A protein has these predicted regions:
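C-terminal accessory module of base-excision DNA glycosylases/AP lyases that mediates lesion recognition
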Residues: 1-28, 86, 90-193
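Phosphate/adenylate-binding glycine loop and adjacent helical scaffold
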Residues: 1-92
């Protein structure tokens, strides 16, 4: 068994790096920046150009808003809660980008909670956290249930809800005792297959 501390150190310092000259010197900002980089992988498709425009060259409009919302949240963090906040703040942003930013941020915060578990514990309702939808998840889900899916960067809210429902169906079938949120599917699918 590999030493757990080594794995934890890798996850928390390399995978979720604190950026150079960050606007905010805390782990929340590091998690949001990492999630943003994940979203921007999809920017090459040209389908999330409004999001890309508002968050390029250090503008970070959406990231900054998400940061403040999480810091000032009066309720437990969940996908629906944060997605709704971002949609209300800027209705022009592509839903695909919003869901990925929110869900990847929550995923990284869950990892930080588990691995660092110190003063920076975030109050997350994991049962209400959705799986971040991207090409990897859609490919694995398609292999499981045979359903074709459009490119994640083209997804609107109703496509997203359909995908989350498919994930929930799978989790209930495979893990009937589980009370996990859909984000668990993301962690399950990253195991080597």
């Amino acid at each position: 068994e590999m030493e757990k501390n080594l794995i934890i150190r890798f996850l928390t310092t390399e995978a979720i790096k604190t950026p150079n000259r960050p606007k905010h010197k805390d782990r929340l900002w590091a998690a949001i920046r990492k999630a943003h980089r994940d979203v921007m992988i999809g920017a090459r498709s040209g389908n999330i150009s409004k999001y890309a425009e508002k968050n390029k060259d250090g503008k970070d409009e959406t990231l900054e808003y998400l940061y403040q919302e999480i810091l000032n949240a009066k309720e437990r963090l969940s996908s629906g809660f944060l997605i709704q906040k971002l949609q209300k703040n800027d209705g022009t942003l592509e839903f695909a980008a919003i869901q990925k930013l929110v869900n990847m941020t929550l995923k990284y915060l869950i990892i930080l909670n588990e691995c660092e578990g110190t003063a920076s514990v975030f109050d997350i309702c994991e049962e209400k956290c959705d799986c971040p939808v991207d090409s990897t998840i859609l490919e694995k889900l398609g292999r499981i249930n045979g359903n074709p899916h459009k490119c994640w960067t083209n997804m609107d809210e109703s496509d997203y809800i359909d995908v989350q429902n498919e994930i929930q169906t799978y989790l209930k079938k495979e893990y009937p005792q589980g009370t996990h949120g859909n984000i668990w599917f993301d962690f399950l699918m990253w195991k080597v297959d």
